């Protein structure tokens, strides 16, 4: 699959958002065009939907629940996560995509995540250069360490560990659909990240 970086069209409030921040978005967008980002957009964090239903899926269906610092309950309650995210007025959301032979093969699918996490790290660095403090949410559970220190000791790599978007109770499909971000389906995996900034 050919990867391309597509800026979604801005409407109304997003043009105001771009003017209201000191960040050099053109510089970030230029640098992002060198990465395998498929789609991205700048959003207002007030648009995000936080729900306990998403957290319930983590708790009842995800085998990583209560096993890493990137997952519940280590990340806090949904309300604590909401407050943490809304300390930032803006976020950059973006996706990468990769084609796999069988999307039902979880091992094959998860093996593609490392590249997205590296892209996320690079994008977070670009935003951090412009804004200072950022909060990064990305995909699935953290897999940096073979055995996570949770719950016995602090995270060994807090600067590299990105909690999962859904772990914070964020309804990723809602914000993605409202901004025209596509989840293609079939055997195409869409990885999704948010970089919050002020």
Regions found by a protein language model. Give the residues of each.
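Short, Lys/Arg-enriched N-terminal segments with co-localized hydrophobic residues
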Residues: 10-22
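Short, conserved charged micro-motifs
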Residues: 21-27, 103-104
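N-terminal domain-onset segments
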Residues: 26-41
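Catalytic cores of enzyme domains
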Residues: 38-68, 72-198
